[in-house]
């Protein structure tokens, strides 16, 4: 991770290695890290760096206040709407995109700031994370042969559902301490910025 610009503690680096190994197991479940911490701690950057490290396709969704399950199932294609083309006005949602991508290559799915979305989103994600599948109406889509690694970030705006917590590994991502901050900047330990 460090070679790609992410400076992690030794414990977090080990956890990321174990997380990568979990995706290689023969299992339908999708390995999931729930990264919690204050804004600016590097949670999203960790997920993006992991995707680069393993050479995976990155799928990203930014949650927003009152975001519902429909935003994970489909997405509005503005270009199709503007052209009044009904066939192209709706496109696959982020979960279906991740499942389809996993047929050809590994995927890193980043669900950023889940705590901003409505609580029912937590329950909606359960079958996807536990069984690697998504059911929309009468159609069921399943994970391909390649792994999907899921990173969920939270700034603790609301409680995350207990069932979702049980399907993910919770990790507190602290802001860099003084020594790590200086290392990131490439400065010596005795630099004056370390005393501010």
Residue ranges and their predicted role:
Residues 1-194:
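AAA+ P-loop NTPase catalytic core and its hallmark functional loops
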């Amino acid at each position: 991770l460090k070679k790609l610009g992410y400076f992690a503690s030794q414990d977090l680096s080990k956890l990321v290695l174990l997380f990568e190994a979990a995706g290689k197991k023969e299992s339908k479940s999708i390995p999931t890290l729930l990264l919690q911490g204050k804004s600016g701690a590097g949670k999203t950057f960790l997920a993006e760096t992991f995707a680069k490290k393993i050479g995976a396709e990155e799928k990203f969704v930014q949650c927003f206040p009152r975001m519902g399950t429909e935003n994970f199932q489909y997405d509005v294609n503005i270009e199709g709407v503007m052209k009044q083309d009904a066939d192209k006005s709706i496109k696959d949602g982020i979960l279906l995109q991740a499942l389809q991508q996993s047929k050809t290559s590994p995927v890193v799915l980043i669900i950023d700031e889940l705590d901003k979305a409505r609580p029912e989103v937590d329950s909606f994600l359960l079958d996807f994370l536990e069984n690697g599948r998504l059911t929309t109406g009468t159609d069921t889509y399943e994970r391909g042969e390649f792994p999907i690694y899921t990173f969920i970030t939270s700034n603790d705006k609301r409680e995350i559902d207990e069932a979702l917590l049980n399907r993910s590994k919770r990790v507190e991502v602290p802001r860099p301490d003084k020594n790590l901050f200086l290392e990131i900047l490439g400065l010596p330990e005795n630099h004056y910025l370390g005393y501010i």
